[in-house]
Regions:
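Extended amphipathic alpha-helical scaffolds
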Residues: 1-46, 51, 58, 229-371, ...
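Glycine-rich, flexible beta-strand/loop modules in the N-terminal catalytic cores of phosphate-handling
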Residues: 27-110, 115-122, 181, 188, ...
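Conserved phosphate/anionic-ligand binding catalytic regions in large, soluble enzymes, centered on
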Residues: 29-31, 39, 122-140, 334-357, ...
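Flexible, glycine/charged-enriched surface loops at secondary-structure junctions
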Residues: 103-109, 144-146, 213-231, 262-263, ...
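Mobile "lid/hinge" segments at catalytic clefts and subdomain interfaces of large enzymes
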Residues: 140-259, 453-549
Length: 723
């Protein structure tokens, strides 16, 4: 019934296998990829031919909680929309594969990855990336090459291929690389400040492993692949191209040189309209041949691309006139939004980002309960890209995949500098609003967010800046560009985003559209990016040169103290009575941990100080000389009165001291339960847990030092500690 084909590749210390012929046989290509007990079903399905001028490719990653033996926590106990992990994985599948589709491929195409089993040792993202390419390999889609993917970690100084998931939080470098047998196409990385040389070493290791995976996919295709569909690439009328170049070429060059993004686009569109009007003339009935219009538009687009690329790569002239390593003018400003806890505005050319910081209590941390190991986050970054940022009107219906990807990239860049919870017990959310965009908005959000964190008083270990690098390669001529603008990104061969501190790289994202990018070119790009990053850090320091010492007056006040774990009961009280009363009195949130750590959160510092003082008094060991005003009598006996000093701790006022200088036959003649009196500790017997008291206005007590009080004593007896 099943004609199963299975191949495998030894990658690092493990094995990745590809199997087809058993599951999802009606898909155009279906592969189960497996490592350990993690198993992902990946399918490639070819639909109908569409009358469009773009590649109709969609990539979906569908997490199923059963894969990890879990039940969804939603009301209906069913998975909803894709989470961040699934979205980021879908983007990592899409980005290296999309450039490999043939030009003119207009069949509806969908790639789907469904994790079927997750062992929480081997993450499913790497398997999904490999499985999607393997599914395409055996499908009718004539992609140009197979794409393999690996994760390279640096742990305790050593590079590790596909490190186990439990070590990911400890990695000095977490690098995901995708590529073909010939070249690297995509890189995603987060790091704690590694050097450019370490990145290149990791890429070299990754490519060697990728070649093994590509070989396995080729073997699978040879054994189980379907016949490929033939696609006729759209042909451009070269004669028409030359005619347009002769008649309107110079006008296009002049339009490209126009200053300002919107003005440049307007000038270019005007030339294009003139070209279409000249070469696609309406017939006698006033109708225009749409095929002719498409031919003319394709020709003028080809001339535009060739003109810009040749000017940059050969003539070393960028559209806005900058040198290859020149960064657009930068303006930095902090404290833009008065009520937020920290804000900063970063403007680089026509790209402008406003980042805002909100601080919260640790109760606001984010629980990550997906197919991987359950974790919590106390720092996250969100990125928004409203349509007005590029001068357009459009729908605003929540974050798109691109927004989620850019937010995650900036988060990786910044997280290495965030202080630990013990030294800064806050949850931190940063939101970057893209107000204008002409390229490199994700790196602009890194810069703005780093300044906003410092303005908020978050004690980051170092400021972080980011810069987007580009590449234009024409034959043997190439040029690496610093701080690419939108047109250079669109028409270029590489988008290489690098973020980091003055000391090293903390995040990296690279997408390469061609195969001829050598390690020498990558080395040049990294070195040039380092120079650009240092320059930007200098500009940021002019606006704010380090974290502020004080938090915003609008930020919640937080204090963390340690108490004796045996005193936790005194803070909590019977049935939580005491801690609830404290929270109400001081408008606070109070968290008590088993090790005696107590965190107090309140709207103001005064309220926090009051709560801290009260908790300290409740948990403090009584010492000779300590005075307790308005202490409550909790019980009277024939030999004295028990007085509550703090919750859980009583002392004894002996009958001989109930009324100084006078004999008392019965304590009840002087005191009753519920009375409030001022007492002073005059005796502490820790071995027997007894505390002896005298009235604070007793002449034998007033004005005495602890040593003198110890000599006075309590008269008789004492009282156990703990009531």
């Amino acid at each position: 019934m099943f004609d199963v084909t299975r191949v495998s590749a030894d990658v690092g210390d493990g094995q990745i296998s590809f199997e087809t012929g058993k599951l999802a046989k009606q898909a155009s290509g279906a592969v189960v990829v497996r490592s350990g007990d993690t198993m992902v079903l990946c399918t490639a399905t070819v639909g109908n031919l569409r009358d469009v001028d773009f590649l109709p490719l969609t990539v979906d990653v569908e997490e199923r909680m059963y894969a990890a033996g879990k039940i969804p926590g939603s009301f209906f106990r069913r998975e909803g929309r894709s989470g961040e992990k699934a979205t980021l994985t879908a983007r990592m599948i899409d980005r290296p594969i999309r450039p490999l589709f043939p030009k003119g491929w207009h069949y509806e195409t969908q790639l789907v990855a469904i994790p079927m089993s997750v062992d929480q040792v081997n993450p499913y993202d790497i398997l999904a990336m490999n499985g999607a390419s393997a599914a395409l390999a055996i499908s009718p889609v004539p992609v140009a090459a197979h794409v393999g993917a690996v994760r390279i970690g640096k742990h305790e100084g050593d590079f590790v291929v596909n490190p186990p998931e439990e070590t990911h939080e400890e990695l000095e470098l977490d690098l995901i690389v995708a590529g073909t047998e010939e070249a690297i196409l995509m890189v995603e990385a987060g790091a704690s400040g590694v050097t450019e040389a370490e990145i290149l070493d990791a890429l070299d290791i990754a490519h060697a492993e990728i070649k093994k995976l590509c070989a396995a996919m080729e073997e699978l295709q040879q054994k189980a692949g379907k016949e490929k569909l033939e696609v006729e690439a759209p042909q451009i009328d070269e004669a028409l191209v030359e005619e347009i170049r002769a008649s309107h070429g110079q006008a296009l060059v002049d339009a490209i040189a126009t200053e300002g993004k919107l003005e440049r686009y307007e000038a270019i569109d005007k030339v294009k309209d003139e070209v279409v009007g000249h070469y696609a003339v309406p017939d006698e009935a006033g109708e225009v041949d749409e095929e002719r219009v498409a031919e003319v538009k394709a020709a003028i687009d080809s001339i535009e691309k060739e003109t810009i690329r040749k000017a940059i790569a050969v003539e070393k002239k960028r559209p806005d006139g900058r040198a290859q390593d020149e960064i657009r003018p930068i303006e930095c400003e902090v404290d833009i939004s008065p009520r937020v806890h920290g804000s900063a505005l970063f403007t680089r050319g026509e790209t402008q980002i406003l980042s805002n910081v909100a601080l919260g209590t640790t109760r606001m941390d984010m629980r990550i309960d997906t197919l991987g190991l359950q974790t919590t986050k106390r720092f996250w970054h969100h990125y928004n890209f409203p349509p007005f940022s590029v001068g357009e009107a459009g729908f605003m219906r929540g974050p798109k995949r691109r927004d989620i990807g850019h937010g995650a990239l900036a988060e990786r860049a910044l997280v290495a500098t965030i202080p630990d919870e013990e030294s800064f017990p806050y949850v931190i959310r940063v939101v970057s609003e893209t107000l204008e965009s002409n390229g490199s908005s994700s790196m602009g959000s890194v810069c703005a967010s780093s300044m906003a964190l410092q303005a908020a008083g978050v004690p980051v270990t170092a400021p972080v800046a980011g810069v987007a690098m580009g590449l234009i390669k024409e034959g043997e001529d190439y040029i690496v560009l610093t701080d690419i603008a939108g047109v250079e990104d669109h028409l270029g061969d590489m988008d290489f985003k690098v973020a980091g501190t003055a000391e090293g790289i903390t995040a990296l994202q690279m997408d390469i559209k061609i195969t001829g990018v050598t390690f020498d070119i990558l080395r040049d790009a990294l070195e040039q990016a380092n120079k650009g990053r240092q320059f930007i850090l200098g500009k940021m320091a002019e606006a704010i040169d380090g974290p502020r010492e004080k938090l915003s007056v609008h930020a919640p006040a937080i204090e963390s103290i340690k108490i004796d774990p045996e005193k936790i009961g005194a803070v909590i009280g019977k049935g939580g009575e005491t801690i609830r009363a404290l929270c109400e009195e001081f408008e606070a949130e109070i968290d008590v941990e088993d090790d005696g750590t107590v965190r107090i959160y309140a709207p103001t510092g005064e309220l926090v100080d009051g709560a801290v003082s009260r908790i300290n008094s409740m948990t403090k060991e009584a010492e000779i000389g300590d005075r307790y005003d308005s202490a409550k009598v909790v019980k009277t006996t024939t030999f004295g009165a028990f007085v509550e000093l703090v919750k859980g701790t009583d002392g004894l006022l002996h009958i001989s001291n109930v009324k100084p200088g006078e004999r008392v036959d019965s304590v009840d003649d002087v005191l009753s339960a519920g009375d409030q009196i001022d007492v002073t500790v005059v005796e502490v017997d820790k071995e027997r847990g007894r505390i002896g008291l005298r009235l604070s206005d007793d002449p034998s007590v007033a004005g005495k030092s602890p040593q003198e009080l110890a000599a006075v004593g309590s008269g008789d007896g004492g009282r156990r500690n703990g009531g």
